[in-house]
Amino acid sequence: MKALVLSSGGVDSTTALGMAAAEYGKENVIALSISYGQKHDKEIRAAEAVAQYYGVEQLFLDLSKIFTYSNCSLLKQSTEEIPQESYAGQLEKISQRDGENPVSTYVPFRNGLFLSSAASIALSKECSVIYYGAHADDAAGCAYPDCSDVFNNAMNEAVWEGSGHQLRIEAPFVKMNKADVVKIGLSLGVPYELTWSCYEGGERPCGKCGTCIDRAAAFAANGVEDPALKYRQEKRLS
């Protein structure tokens, strides 16, 4: 049995990759990293480092043209700045202005496109399961609607039926928060020092964007320092 893992180089997808490698063995795991026109390539480089660490096959796919018409703040062509505040703060402002809507860093239907593309590749590579790292914090308040349990169940059913019952989706964290994801990863020895989450592309994480804030809180909840911050500090000083 083989597994394909959507690997962005961040905490959640790297934990999912660690789980898949532990479950199926590295020789039966493929990492798929997708470019979508984001403002920097730090996460793709992190995904490469993670794949090398686990010794798994890695594939790359460029879907950037699909998102050419979006003004999502994560994308190169966007006229919007990436918000420098927590998701809770962003959602509160959005709610007051527009009601329940996604945050500006929501890439339109990204997970739907990623999973559909991954399904085609997974079937071609004789995989029977796709792993991805969506978790409950991302879906909260409709911040990222394509991370919800409802969305995951619908996509899983579509992939299962559309593949002739050959392929399913595994989203192990969809009912967990990010702190729970980190807890699992720490128990598996996931190389978080190699990961990148920040929406900015600087030498060090900005510490101010929504994903940086969530990441810091998740490690703090587990009583540990973020290994990536320590790792980058040591590299800078060496």
Predicted feature residues:
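Short functional micro-motifs and their immediate structural scaffolds
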Residues: 25, 190-191, 214-217
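Short, intrinsically disordered, charge-biased short linear motifs at domain edges
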Residues: 185-187, 192-201
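ATP-dependent adenylation/nucleotidyltransferase module used to activate substrates
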Residues: 1-189
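Iron-sulfur (Fe-S) cluster-binding segments and ferredoxin-like electron-carrier domains
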Residues: 127, 204, 210-234
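Local cysteine-cluster metal-coordination motifs and their immediate loop/turn environment
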Residues: 112, 116, 196-217
